[in-house]
Structures are given as C-alpha cells and as structure tokens.
Design a protein with these regions (language model features):
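Bacterial Sec-dependent N-terminal signal peptides
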Residues: 1-31
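Positively charged, low-complexity terminal tracts
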Residues: 25-192
Length: 192
C-alpha cells in the first residue's frame, strides 16, 4: 500500500470507525421504565410486604404510572389481605461516605392502602386549594410537607407544568403532575 493511501485511511476513515462508540458513550438516556419497575417490584412486594408462603399465594400488581423522566413509578398491589401503593425511585442518589459519591440506582417505598389514599388526597387538595399561590410565581412559590419519611415539594415551572418532587432515602425524584393524576385515578380504579 502506498503512503498516500495509509495517510488517507488514518485521516478520513479511522475517525468514522470510532464515531459510533462516541455516540453511544455520550447517550444520556435513562435505562429504567415502567416495565422494569414492574419486574423489580415483584420481589420487593413478596419479600418486604407480603412475606413468605410455604404453600402458595396469589397477588396482583398494576403499574399505575411512570413519570416521563422515569424517576418515579407508582405500582398498586393487592394480595394476602394487604393492598397499597409502592413508589419506585430511580435516579442518582448520594452516598455520604469518605468520598461522598453519586450513584445511579433504584429503591421502593411501600405505602399501605389507607396511608396511600391519605397521601394522594392530600397532594390533590394542596394543588387545588393553593392553585392561586402556586400560579402566582413560577418556580418561586413552593409548598412542602413530610409524609412517612418522605419530603414532598410542590411547585410550578412554566404554564401547565405542575411539579411534585419527592426526597426519600437519598433519592430526589420528580413526580410530574400528569403522572400523579394518572396514579390517583388508576389507584382509585384498581381498588374497586
């Protein structure tokens, strides 16, 4: 091969061989979805909520809604005379150790049936009763409350962009207003 060809190959062709690798490595797409939450939540519900079964037991789970950011997924469960709402968190979380590191991971929070109804109604009530306050100044007027080890922050960011942020167990996830309303509607439908 001539020196010209080798030089041409190095300058023009070789970078194109690495181009797909650069594209893949720069992808910021989250790899979590409602389907994965459903898959992972099954064993969480069995081991942490329903408990062991020597013979066999049946249970139902329904993935209610996932926020577009995939940070929070809501799942209804019913089995062994227990029912409720599981919130799945997926995002970066902070571990305060000697290095103070950030990791990507997931975790689930169980909210028993009565408490779930209480929580969903409280959020809806705050949004309805404080609409004027929340709409007055985007991203400036905020409402917060604590519920079962979680901190809820409600605010607006732009027209028709209600936000609900939940901080729990080193996760900080956003539950979009649309996903919240879908969760509430489908949760109420699932219990009938």
């Amino acid at each position: 091969m001539s020196d010209k060809f080798i030089k041409f190959f190095k300058q023009l062709i070789l970078p194109f061989l690495f181009f797909p690798i650069l594209l893949v490595s720069q992808s910021g797409v989250k790899e979590y979805s409602k389907d994965i939450a459903l898959y992972e939540a099954k064993f969480f519900i069995i081991s942490e909520i329903l408990g062991p079964s020597l013979d066999y037991d049946k249970f139902v789970i329904d993935p209610l809604a996932a926020s577009k950011s995939s940070e929070i997924t809501s799942i209804f469960y019913d089995g062994k005379n227990k029912k409720g709402l599981v919130l799945g968190f997926f995002d970066d979380f902070w571990v305060q150790d000697s290095r103070s590191s950030n990791f990507k991971g997931y975790s689930f929070k169980n909210i028993e049936y009565e408490k779930a109804i209480q929580l969903l109604n409280k959020i809806e009530s705050i949004i309805e009763n404080e609409k004027k306050f929340l709409n007055a100044d985007d991203n400036e007027n905020n409402i917060y409350f604590n519920f079962e080890e979680m901190v809820f922050l409600i605010y607006r960011e732009g027209p028709l962009r209600g936000r609900i942020r939940i901080s729990w167990n080193n996760f900080d996830g956003e539950w979009e207003n649309t996903a919240f309303r879908r969760t509430k509607r489908r949760f109420e439908k699932s219990i009938n």
